[in-house]
């Protein structure tokens, strides 16, 4: 179903606004609307809060609809100005979750701006950077070195979604992910590439509908044999047959988001070292 109407959506924070936008997008994805996104970060003074109120109210007047306003504001005086003054539908995420938790836990939260992504809190930041570097070094079969250090190894035909999934797992979960493209030489051998065999338990396969694969490849190399539908059908069939013979778990990425693919991989492979 196509989106039926538009609505301006504000994401307001005294930090970067990334958390507000992430939560907001997750919620809005449940509705058939076409949002116009406006992120307003670093709203950390009362003067800035009054400017935000004017911007929201101007938008409401122009469009004749209440803008949707997601906030992750720690500063209560700033939040109150926006709550009291704006003519939008305000959804205060921190207020929704933090204040009930304070009551239940019997302790006050830190009320620190940017606490969610504070890189000084622990060594998780450096671990994630290390995971990203590992995943880049081992992208598309570039390196077979230190595969024993990989948490997950993805295999599949070219353009089946291995690279974006690898980077998502590295950035969001701190996992070291290698990925390897299955090519005609692998199909001729009818078995996994020798370098991957010792790490079979870490391997997860991605496949894709041949017609969709042909469309994706045509965007990259239009009219080529690489993008030809018959070739795509053959490659996908060979890859799936190899994964079945080798006992490799796999899924089709055709209609799935990166988040859905990554979650399935985590459930199936269950890597020991996992950060959220």
Swiss-Prot record:
Q: Give the reaction(s) catalysed.
A: [pyruvate, water dikinase] + ADP = [pyruvate, water dikinase]-phosphate + AMP + H(+); [pyruvate, water dikinase]-phosphate + phosphate + H(+) = [pyruvate, water dikinase] + diphosphate
Decide whether keyword Ribonucleoprotein is in the record. Answer: no
Where does the source fall among the domains of life?
Bacteria
Which cysteines are disulphide-bonded? none
Q: What is its EC number?
A: 2.7.11.33, 2.7.4.28
Q: Name one Pfam family in it.
A: Kinase-PPPase
GO molecular-function term, one example from the UniProt record? protein serine/threonine kinase activity
Q: Which residues bind ADP?
A: 156-163
Keyword terms of this UniProt record: Kinase, Nucleotide-binding, Serine/threonine-protein kinase, Transferase
- InterPro entries given for it? Kinase-pyrophosphorylase, PSRP
Q: What does this protein do?
A: Bifunctional serine/threonine kinase and phosphorylase involved in the regulation of the phosphoenolpyruvate synthase (PEPS) by catalyzing its phosphorylation/dephosphorylation.
What PANTHER family has UniProt attached to this entry? PYRUVATE, PHOSPHATE DIKINASE REGULATORY PROTEIN 1, CHLOROPLASTIC
To which protein family does this belong?
Answer: Belongs to the pyruvate, phosphate/water dikinase regulatory protein family. PSRP subfamily.
Protein name (record): Putative phosphoenolpyruvate synthase regulatory protein
Organism lineage string: Bacteria, Pseudomonadati, Pseudomonadota, Betaproteobacteria, Burkholderiales
């Amino acid at each position: 179903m196509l989106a039926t109407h538009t609505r301006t959506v504000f994401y307001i924070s005294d930090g970067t606004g990334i958390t507000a936008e992430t939560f907001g997008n997750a919620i809005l994805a449940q509705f058939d609307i076409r949002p116009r996104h406006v992120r307003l970060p670093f709203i950390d003074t009362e003067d800035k809060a009054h400017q935000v109120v004017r911007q929201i109210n101007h938008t409401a007047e122009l469009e004749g609809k209440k803008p949707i306003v997601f906030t992750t504001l720690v500063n209560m005086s700033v939040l109150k100005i926006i709550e009291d003054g704006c003519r939008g539908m305000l959804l205060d995420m921190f207020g929704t979750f933090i204040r009930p938790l304070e009551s239940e836990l019997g302790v006050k939260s830190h009320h620190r701006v940017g606490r969610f992504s504070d890189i000084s809190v622990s060594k998780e930041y450096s671990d994630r950077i290390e995971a990203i570097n590992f995943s880049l070094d081992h992208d598309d079969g570039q390196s077979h070195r230190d595969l024993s250090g990989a948490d997950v190894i993805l295999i599949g035909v070219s353009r089946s979604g291995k690279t974006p999934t690898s980077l998502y797992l590295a950035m969001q979960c701190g996992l070291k992910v290698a990925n390897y493209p299955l090519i005609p030489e692998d199909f001729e051998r009818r078995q996994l590439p020798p370098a991957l065999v010792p790490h079979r338990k870490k391997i997860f396969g991605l496949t894709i509908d041949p017609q969709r694969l042909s469309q994706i490849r045509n965007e990259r190399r239009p009219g080529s044999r690489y993008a030809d539908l018959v070739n795509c059908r053959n490659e996908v069939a060979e890859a799936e047959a190899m994964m079945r013979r080798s006992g490799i778990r796999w899924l089709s990425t055709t209609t799935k988001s990166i988040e859905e693919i990554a979650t399935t991989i985590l459930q199936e492979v269950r890597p020991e070292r996992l950060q959220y």
